[in-house]
């Protein structure tokens, strides 16, 4: 593999509703990158103000911000799903496709390639590498086929592209999608023969553990501790390879599956108390979210 992914810029979106997620997002980008990547963020005015007041402590890399998401700022997903959209059926679908907007901004600003990450991504290493000569990289859910039929084969919160026309292709595909921006990625994959799929160690979400084709206990058994990685890591491996990133809301208080996943993962990390980055991350999560 080349270092293509690690040379890419990072794009994300988030309003004040996602502030807890953004704190973890930036903290872990700082923790596992000696030179944190350039980030493009679309947000609301409150989020922009909070970041600008404490930028040096929030993010060490270059951070470009546009507060163009004010119309979504006071609403959660449930409200947006009940609100009529402008381009799409619901406002939630409009909001999801702001992912394409932030990618377009990065390309217009001169980026050669870009990741889009949901703001609830937690990084446990440097950005994943992407093979040379690839234009699109996607993250499979690795869930049961029956769930894929509903939610899509790929997760829309972890996408890489080197194609400046991809954002508009994504918007167009979303108009025909059975599940928002997410199942739309299958159309992009069908039309892009060079697509790369990220492995299971990348973008690991609760759904991968609890909606997988194997039982949660079997999937947990594939996780191991390995303290002496030669790359920046949190000291955990899946199927013998370093854990790169997870996809979760650390501040979730109501959903029992997310809470179970978070507590289990934190417990694995706390077992590695002599691993500096693992210890730093665990302290941060316990302090911010009172998890034990």
Regions found by a protein language model. Give the residues of each.
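N-terminal anchoring/stem segment of glycosyltransferases
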Residues: 1-82, 108-111, 265, 273-292
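Short, solvent-exposed loop/turn segments at secondary-structure junctions
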Residues: 16-18, 46-48, 121-123, 142-145, ...
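A structural signal for well-ordered alpha-helical segments within the folded catalytic domains
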Residues: 20-23, 97-101, 179-187
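Short, charged, surface-exposed secondary-structure boundary motifs
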Residues: 22-23, 27, 68-78, 145-154, ...
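Charged, glycine/proline-rich intrinsically disordered loops and linkers
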Residues: 64-91, 210-232
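GT-A fold catalytic core of metal-dependent nucleotide-sugar glycosyltransferases
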Residues: 94-148
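Conserved catalytic core of nucleotide-sugar-dependent glycosyltransferases
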Residues: 124-188
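Catalytic core and acceptor-binding pocket of nucleotide-sugar-dependent glycosyltransferases
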Residues: 161-261
